[in-house]
Amino acid sequence: MKTARRRAREFAVQGIYEWELNPDRPASLIEKHLRENEYFAKADEALFRSILYGVLKDVELLSAQVGRYYERAEDEVSPVERAVLLMAALELTQSPETPYPVIINEAIEITKTFGGTDGHKFVNGVLDKLAAEVRGDEVLAQKQRRKQD
């Protein structure tokens, strides 16, 4: 069963994807369209809104952050992968209360649901590098805990 937070992230990714394909469309219309889905009521609305509006507000900064770690040409990154990466970049940089492994795992699972065959591997690689940059202390602590186990 999907959690309310997973649903919120999935709807946010769909909204970011929709915006990527039609950047002149206002976020409020994208949100209205997504709310028509019968499962939207089961999503964490506050998280959905913070991700959708946060990504669209800071898209240039977030794009630059994830783009540094692409190991392929930017035009080879699918719109789904890009939407997931933008969502996760926002959470990694602006939601320190959410552990980075949770953010990366959610991004991988959403990419498996909506993306291409191996898109999740690309997303994982980019986000691992971004997490090391923006949450270095947390990543280091996690690695040290793993060594002790």
Curated annotation (Swiss-Prot):
Please provide, in alphabetical order, the Gene Ontology terms of the cellular component aspect for this entry: cytosol
Example of a GO MF term: RNA binding
InterPro entries from the entry? NusB-like_sf, NusB_fam, NusB_RsmB_TIM44
Q: Does the keyword S-adenosyl-L-methionine apply?
A: no
Q: Which UniProt keywords apply?
A: RNA-binding, Transcription, Transcription antitermination, Transcription regulation
Q: Which Pfam family, any one of them, does this sequence belong to? A: NusB
In the record, biological process GO terms are: DNA-templated transcription termination; transcription antitermination
Gene3D superfamilies per the record? Answer: NusB-like
Q: Which family does it belong to?
A: Belongs to the NusB family.
NCBIfam families associated with the record = nusB
* Role this protein plays: Involved in transcription antitermination. Required for transcription of ribosomal RNA (rRNA) genes. Binds specifically to the boxA antiterminator sequence of the ribosomal RNA (rrn) operons.
Q: What's the name of the protein?
A: Transcription antitermination protein NusB
Q: Which organism is it from?
A: Chromobacterium violaceum (strain ATCC 12472 / DSM 30191 / JCM 1249 / CCUG 213 / NBRC 12614 / NCIMB 9131 / NCTC 9757 / MK)
